[in-house]
Swiss-Prot record:
This is Large ribosomal subunit protein uL16. It holds the Pfam family Ribosomal_L16. InterPro entries: Ribosomal_uL16, Ribosomal_uL16_bact-type, Ribosomal_uL16_CS, Ribosomal_uL16_dom, Ribosomal_uL16_sf. Part of the 50S ribosomal subunit. PROSITE patterns: RIBOSOMAL_L16_1 (PS00586), RIBOSOMAL_L16_2 (PS00701). The gene is rplP. One of its GO terms (cellular component) is ribonucleoprotein complex. It comes from Prochlorococcus marinus (strain MIT 9515).
């Protein structure tokens, strides 16, 4: 199970999940990825279950990258405890996921789009957030201004 080796503080506030992911929202390592569509907490157990499902389907061919890490402790009080007497002890770890965040990436010579899509579909069932399959050959965020300028220059050269 994934968890930090050490943290500065044992307990954290629950926090708010608003906005979209500004970091970790592009494919960096593989050709295919699983991208979050809404926000939520993904536990270390859910990450491990998803990883196992994908690894089992691809039969250890190719490579899988986990792009999220559970670094937030979630505390719980013992059952039937009276109110007060402080905050509970950390029980498990979660990764805070915002829309647009890449959760898993997959790549390799043996991995085709069909294999990756099916493996990611199996992983989707293990996760509490809505996700979608994306591949690196399709531009995720639309055309950037730089790409539009390059395309415009190339079409002008063809016309001359």
């Amino acid at each position: 199970m994934l968890s930090p080796k050490r943290t500065k503080f044992r307990k954290q506030h629950r926090g708010r999940m608003k906005g979209i992911a500004s970091k970790g929202n592009t494919i960096a390592f593989g050709q295919f990825a699983l991208q979050a569509q809404d926000c939520g907490w993904v536990t270390a157990r859910q990450i491990e279950a998803s990883r196992r499902a994908m690894t089992r389907y691809v039969k250890r061919g190719g490579k899988i990258w986990i792009r999220i890490f559970p670094d937030k402790p979630v505390t719980m009080r013992p059952a039937e405890t009276r109110m007060g007497s402080g905050k509970g002890n950390p029980e498990f770890w979660v990764a805070v996921v915002k829309p647009g965040r890449i959760l898993f990436e997959m790549g390799g010579e043996e991995i085709t789009e069909e294999i990756a899509k099916e493996a990611m579909r199996l992983a989707q069932y293990k996760l509490p957030v809505k996700t979608k399959f994306i591949s690196s050959d399709k531009i995720v965020g639309g055309d950037s201004p730089v790409e539009k300028a390059i395309e415009k220059e190339s079409t002008e050269e063809v016309k001359k």
